[in-house]
């Protein structure tokens, strides 16, 4: 299996409360963070989609909207909505605010898709990264079951589904832009 045979979905539906503004629209090199991620991953994957509660991008991207079945704001709903759009395949899911994840990290996770796992996510010494990994589309119903019980955390899947945590030493590759200072620092590194 090759990366260019797979689909990628960039999650852009977070509340961005710590950032104080919508992270998906932060500007990097004359484009917003969403466009930055879509451009990068379009060179790697078959298709790149954007996941959000509504179309805040004026039809600029292939959008997967959160399902209207549940009136919640959660990563589990986003994952359920994403996986419901695909049939019998792995999908790479990444939060828009993880701009340093790239092909090297993906290639380290890729071999585990051929093994007997349904979830393959990145893990660093300090964190598991549930919004950086491959999820099999067959998990949509399991996500729905959690939502029906008002369980919103993606991490709940890991105890029920065969999951591979792919170990990475470098925390920096999985930088998450939660605060404006982190965004400013990352922006200055791009120059």
Curated annotation (Swiss-Prot):
Keyword Magnesium listed: yes
Binding site for Mg(2+): 97
Catalytic activity from the UniProt record: Mo-molybdopterin + GTP + H(+) = Mo-molybdopterin guanine dinucleotide + diphosphate
Compartments (UniProt record): Cytoplasm
Principal place of residence: cytoplasm
Top-level taxon in the UniProt lineage: Bacteria
GO terms of biological process kind: bis(molybdopterin guanine dinucleotide)molybdenum biosynthetic process
CDD domains assigned: MobA (cd02503)
Keyword Magnesium attached: yes
EC numbers on record: 2.7.7.77
Cystine residue pairs: none
Co-factor(s): Mg(2+)
GO molecular function terms listed in the Swiss-Prot or TrEMBL record: GTP binding; metal ion binding; molybdenum cofactor guanylyltransferase activity
Transmembrane stretches, start-end: none
Key words of the record: Cytoplasm, GTP-binding, Magnesium, Metal-binding, Molybdenum cofactor biosynthesis, Nucleotide-binding, Transferase
Any one of the GO CC terms: cytoplasm
A Pfam entry, by short name: NTP_transf_3
Gene3D superfamilies associated with the record: Spore Coat Polysaccharide Biosynthesis Protein SpsA, Chain A (3.90.550.10)
Amino-acid positions noted as binding GTP in the UniProt annotation, renumbered to this chain: 11-13, 23, 66, 97
Domain notes: The N-terminal domain determines nucleotide recognition and specific binding, while the C-terminal domain determines the specific binding to the target protein.
Known role: Transfers a GMP moiety from GTP to Mo-molybdopterin (Mo-MPT) cofactor (Moco or molybdenum cofactor) to form Mo-molybdopterin guanine dinucleotide (Mo-MGD) cofactor.
Family: Belongs to the MobA family.
Subunit structure as annotated in this protein's UniProt entry: Monomer.
Protein name: Molybdenum cofactor guanylyltransferase
Native source species: Campylobacter jejuni subsp. jejuni serotype O:23/36 (strain 81-176)
């Amino acid at each position: 299996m090759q990366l260019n045979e797979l689909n990628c979905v960039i999650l852009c539906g977070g509340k961005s409360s710590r950032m104080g503004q919508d992270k998906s629209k932060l500007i990097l090199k004359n484009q917003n963070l969403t466009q930055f991620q879509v451009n990068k991953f379009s060179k790697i994957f078959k298709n790149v989609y954007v996941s959000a509660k509504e179309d805040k991008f004026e039809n600029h991207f292939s959008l997967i909207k959160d399902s209207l079945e549940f009136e919640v704001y959660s990563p589990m709903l986003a994952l359920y909505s994403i996986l419901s759009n695909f049939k019998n395949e792995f999908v790479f899911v990444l939060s828009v605010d993880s701009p340093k994840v790239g092909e090297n990290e993906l290639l380290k996770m890729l071999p585990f898709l051929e093994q007997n796992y349904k979830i393959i996510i990145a893990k660093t010494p300090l964190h598991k990264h549930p919004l950086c990994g491959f999820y099999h589309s067959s998990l949509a119903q399991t996500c729905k079951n959690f939502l029906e019980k008002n369980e919103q955390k993606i991490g709940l899947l890991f105890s029920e589904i065969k999951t591979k945590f792919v170990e990475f030493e470098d925390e920096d590759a999985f930088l998450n832009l939660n605060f404006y200072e982190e965004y400013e620092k990352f922006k200055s590194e791009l120059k």
